[in-house]
Amino acid sequence: FGNKHPRDIDSAGLGDWVVNPKKLPDGIAGLLRDAAKHNIGFGIWIEPEMINTRSELYEKHPDWVMKVPGQDFITARGGTQAVLDLTNPQVRDFIFYTVDTLLARYPEIEYIKWDANMPVLNHGSVHLDKDEQSHLSILYHQGFEDVCRRIRRKYPDVTIQACASGGGRVN
């Protein structure tokens, strides 16, 4: 994934969920075709809650990362990874749109492994009012549940497995 900032290393391209034709000249359709040829169900591993500061998504929406208002934020994994702010409805819509586009375009996808490979290091949101900051964890989780419900409602037969040991998540 990623074209302007290809995901060749873990410090670039996360959040840019577009196929890189240099890596996959036949795109996801080519992978699906090969899987079908060998009678293998196809699954895809994505990390839609995370972003690299070296990504087109961050260049367009730097305000979408979780951070304490008025402060610099902490990055991890290659010095550029951050967590998208699911308290923000625009972020939730983007994540849903990303997954929806993938599944609508490639209905043969049977399985998603949903990674959240980074802990929340920045306990704040530029989207929330001052009096809502203490509810950040609850509101983030409610935002995550909202996205999952929307995906499940539209794609009830797709298996989705959460994977977050790197993020230390237990939800």
Segments (PLM) and residue ranges:
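Aromatic-lined carbohydrate-binding/catalytic grooves of carbohydrate-active enzymes
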Residues: F1-Y97, Y106, E110-Y111
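Active-site beta-loop-alpha junctions enriched in small/polar residues
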Residues: F1-G2, E47-I51, A116-P119, C163-G167
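A structural signal for isolated positions on well-ordered beta-strands in alpha/beta enzyme cores
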Residues: G43, T159-Q161
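Short acidic (Asp/Glu) and glycine-rich catalytic loops that position anionic groups and cofactors
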Residues: I74-G79, S125-K130, K154
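Alpha-helix-loop-beta-strand connector modules within alpha/beta enzyme cores
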Residues: D26-A35, L136-Y155
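P-loop NTPase motor core
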Residues: A104-Y106, Y111-D146, V158, S165
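Substrate-binding cleft/loops of secretory-pathway carbohydrate-active enzymes
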Residues: N52-H61, Q161-N171
